[in-house]
Amino acid sequence: FRSKYTTPYKSNVVRSISSRKELQLSGKANDHEGIEGKVEFTALTRIENNGGSLEATSDSTLQVKNANSVTLYVSIGTNFVNYKDVSGNALSTAQKYLKQVNKNYAKSKAAHINAYQKYFNRVSLDLGRNAQADKPTDVRVKEFSTSFDPQMAALYFQFGRYLLICSSQPGG
């Protein structure tokens, strides 16, 4: 497979591959309603392949061939320090987060599950279940506006909680 970053931003964006064969997308938020965009971001993706090969096919695309398995580690940093200060370094923040991944996938996943479940398991929501719940998720999403799917509403509620828990932990 091939991996590269794409973005809806039309300007202020640079895609590249580092010397360590990590994908990088850096940019700055667009101006909006006459206000200059000041938040800068850098996204890094480290690809670890088990078997096969990893090679750069362009200045912004990595290709994995004949691998038994592949793990993608994604790290995103911004220059946001607080609402009055955007003096941080997006690249060094993203690099710091990526360097902290020093476990294999199974250990990283287990640590993540342990960390979020102590908050996540405090709440449950049961809005009922009907035949919609037996359909594939992509079908349920497409049909949601025209069908009654209380279990999907509960699932979205829990998904939102999961994202909030994971994105609001100390240190990142």
Where are these regions (language model features)?
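Aromatic-residue-lined binding/catalytic grooves and analogous aromatic/hydrophobic interfacial grooves
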Residues: F1-G172
